[in-house]
Every structure is written in structure tokens, then in C-alpha cells.
Amino acid sequence: MHLKRSFAVIGGDLRQRFLLRQLRGLGFPAAAYRVPDTEDRAPDLSGCLQGANVLILPMPALSGSGVPLAEILNAAAPDALICGGMLGPAEDALRARGLSYFDYAKDEALLLQNAELTAEAALSLLLERLPGPLAGSRILICGFGRIGKLLARKLKALGADVTVSARKPRDLELAHILGYRRVTTGSFADALAQYDGIVNTVPAPVIGPEQLQCVRRDCALLELASLPGGFCAQAQALPGYCAARGLPGKYAPEAAAAIIRSAIFRELNLEEAR
């Protein structure tokens, strides 16, 4: 399809503001509703959606827009494409209405690019919280997915002594091949006392109250995973604990917006430059 694209950007954080600016900078008609720090925005939802055939919700889509999903569905044009991150249960409602949708949080390129931004921000947070210099510090990374792999590489390049915690044998073997120490998740025993920093990327319990007793009080604890996270609730009382979820939107919102825009453009078969 080669329809003229007209965008409506709804709610969200600074990523949505930068996304709106980028779309307008590329010459696309783009209206805004409840986008923060944006003066030129529609007074109501219906005004924002008038003539729009691409609706862009934030990530997460349902809790971040500030607008009930039912209102958006009722006001959207029948031929509109609804774009949002982590649509989840909204997909059923969209299908029931016969509306087209795109969950950009499932786009593999976006996930990799967001992981890179997350790893960069996590590195900065670690530098602020480690009890000593990064070079020579012993860092445990729980989980060896996209973020874990990228962060491990950055830390090792800067001289950290990196240990990777994983459950799958192939992940443990890959960690070994790449030059990291390795340990099976859950088999920490008293070894946690050796680490200067522990970074969790696993959205499931990893370090419980019993394991936490072995962690030094000056250890930097960085929680990157979505809820429920990997650290037990007691970890939050430790001075080195930091809940650092959603880092791309907080530390690099303009770059994160460009990543979202690129994912949507790929879905629409649009060129980056017009």
C-alpha cells in the first residue's frame, strides 16, 4: 500500500515527544495528544485522530498512554494501523474490532538496539555504584540474553572480571568460549560474597533472601529486568541497590524514539529519508 501516511502520537514519555518531532521533521503530518512537553497538541483525542491512519501508542501501550483503550478503539479510523509496545491483552480487543496493529516491542531489530542502549546505561550506573574502579572488579551478570551478552562484552573490554550466570548449557558454554567465568543460576552458594557488582537481567527470582545474606553490603546491585525482577524485596534495603528498568527511555529518549520510528517505518515499508 502507498497511502499517504498521517500519524497520531498518543501519550507516553520523552520518547513519544522526540518521535513526534522526528516525524514532523521528515515532513509527515503528525498530531499529538497527551504527549509530554509538547505545546502543539490536540485538545482532545478525536481531534488528534482526525485524518490519522497510523496511531502510535507508547511502550508499554496500555499503562503509558493515559487514555483508556476503549476510547482509542472507538475513535480510531477503521483502516488505521495501531502501533504500540507490549500491547499484550489489547491484541484481543484489536482483533475483535478488526483493526490492524503492530506491536513494535516484538521487532527483533528494535529489541537488539534497545538492548545496546540498556547496556550502555547500565554500564554508567555501575560506574557510579561500584565500591572501587571497574578494572579488576568482579561482576556477576545474571542472564545471558541480549542485554547480558552486550553488557558482558562492554565490561570485559574495560577490564572487569565478568562471571555469567545462566541455566541453559549452551549459554554457559558460549560464555566460556567468549572468555567469561560461568556459573549455573541458583548454584551460587557462598560465592556471591566475592562480587563487587551484580546485574540481573532475568525477570524471575534469582537472588532470594538466603543468597542475599552472602552479598557484601558495598556490592552494587543493578536490577534491569521487568517485574518481578530477580532480586528479592530485601535487596532494596541495601545501599548499593538500584532498580533500573526502562533505561532507553530514561537515558537516551531521542535515540530510543528513532529506534521505534525505524521499526514502524519497516512495518509500513517507508523509507527512513523522504
Regions found by a protein language model. Give the residues of each.
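Rossmann-fold NAD(P)-binding glycine/threonine-rich loop
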Residues: G85-A105, A225-N269
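A short, basic/flexible loop-to-alpha-helix module at the beginning of a structural domain
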Residues: M1, L123-L134
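Helix N-cap at the beta1-alpha1 junction of Rossmann-like dinucleotide-binding domains, i.e.
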Residues: L14, D37, P169-R170, S226-P228
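Rossmann-like adenosine-cofactor binding region
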Residues: P60-I82, A175-Y251
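NAD(P)-binding Rossmann-fold cofactor-contacting core
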Residues: L26-R41, L158-L178
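A glycine-rich, Thr/Ser-enriched phosphate-binding loop motif common to dinucleotide/cofactor-binding enzymes
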Residues: E108-L127
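N-terminal ligand-binding/catalytic initiation module
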Residues: M1-A93, R97, Y101, A263-R274
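Glycine-rich adenosine-cofactor-binding loop
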Residues: F7-F18, L23, A135-K156
